[in-house]
UniProtKB/Swiss-Prot annotation:
Its EC number is 5.4.2.12. It comes from Vibrio campbellii (strain ATCC BAA-1116). This is 2,3-bisphosphoglycerate-independent phosphoglycerate mutase. It is an enzyme of class 5 (isomerase). The active site is at residue 63.
Amino acid sequence: MSAKKPLALVILDGYGYREDTASNAIANAKTPVMDALIANNPNTLISASGMDVGLPDGQMGNSEVGHTNIGAGRVVYQDLTRITKSIADGEFAETAALVEAIDSAVKAEKAVHIMGLMSPGGVHSHEDHIYAAVEMAAARGAEKIYLHCFLDGRDTPPRSAENSLQRFQDLFAKLGKGRVASLVGRYYAMDRDNNWDRVQVAYDLLTQAKAEFTAETAVAGLEAAYAREENDEFVKATAIKAEGQEDAIMQDGDAVIFMNYRADRARQITRAFVPAFDGFERAVFPAINFVMLTQYAADIPLAIAFPPASLENTYGEWLSKQGQTQLRISETEKYAHVTFFFNGGIENEFEGEERQLVASPKVATYDMQPEMSSPELTEKMVAAIKSGKYDTIICNYPNADMVGHTGVYEAAEQAIEALDESVGKVVEAIKEVSGQMLITADHGNAEMMIDPETGGVHTAHTNLPVPLIYVGDKAVEFKEGGKLSDLAPTMLSLAGLEIPAEMSGEVLVK
């Protein structure tokens, strides 16, 4: 069997590009290898943050999201952005599970109940999504629209719910129908530690309007809670109804839409609406059409508006189907990223996939050993390239990220210099076997070690672009405006392989 000429992808974790050289460990370190590559080889900058990787606009990238996008060859939207995007595109209003639940309630002249964590926190839910759900129910003809507000105060300031509640009171006034029907703190409605007595408080409020307190409006109910010294998170069960209004309880034939997208704190209260349940004794158990916004658990037999997106034909799976061999190699710190996350959340190896793990150094913080285990990793990487065994090699060097996180500037420069030396050896090996290589990063970090706004130490990732450099014999010219999800199609193109239909990323080679 003839020796293979591998295509390598080297991911320099946390190696972003920033024009300003102030507190920029990447620009200021001595990097003869990278300098020569950028001077002489095809290169460009690509985006690794925000909507380009499926995160909210302007949000910095991270390693999990970066590797998932690289391996998928398509933008993988996180739940928050996926749902926000569906609202903007008009798809949300046509989501089958929501349409069916609302229409069945409207037809039977029943109520549509919408519940969820009412805040702009964006961790478990977003009030913009809840707003869209209320508008959708109204547009589809629901007359009774009841909003059950779980109050936040953890992912938002402790007393910040008033603006959100006022916003929805105004919406219902504009619609001329519907109302905020109940308030309760997330401490009760969103427990995740099997404190079923707390969950029962929320369940009884929803199904019986059983509440310690009542108020005529949501804002009045909140003010009363503050007067009792209850912050948002701990607001006791409060039924909202003005004089002459009926109780807004969940009854047979009603639709219930739970607008939290994060599963861990949505599971328990949801399980209380499933027949097989032993968390507490239910005084009533209405036959409702319950819709979960996302899948809270695989064993909850309820409708799901946004089922999990399964990633078919990721880069690793596709290579395996083509009978190709591949190696994933990194230090402990980023091993999961080049394996599990790169494979779209699949733990097991694909056929033809091998993995090599190099132990990260046992130090308290990596500024104490900025080169980390790059010499050992490089030795294994060079041996793998020269072995002739692999069609593709995916390697991650963690230094720029892990040392960047320490905030120690001198150590970050040393980390970049150690990386440069390693990259030089890998480039030599690739050239020796007439292979090809792309050098890139999953997000930025070490290019900004001082926060320009505050003047304090900057230890976080950045939302800056990352380099993409080609090493090899092909006459390559890169397109501008690429992003991480374009890397897999580009690599398949460089290897002369077909690109699967699921990969919507672009080939960045002209």
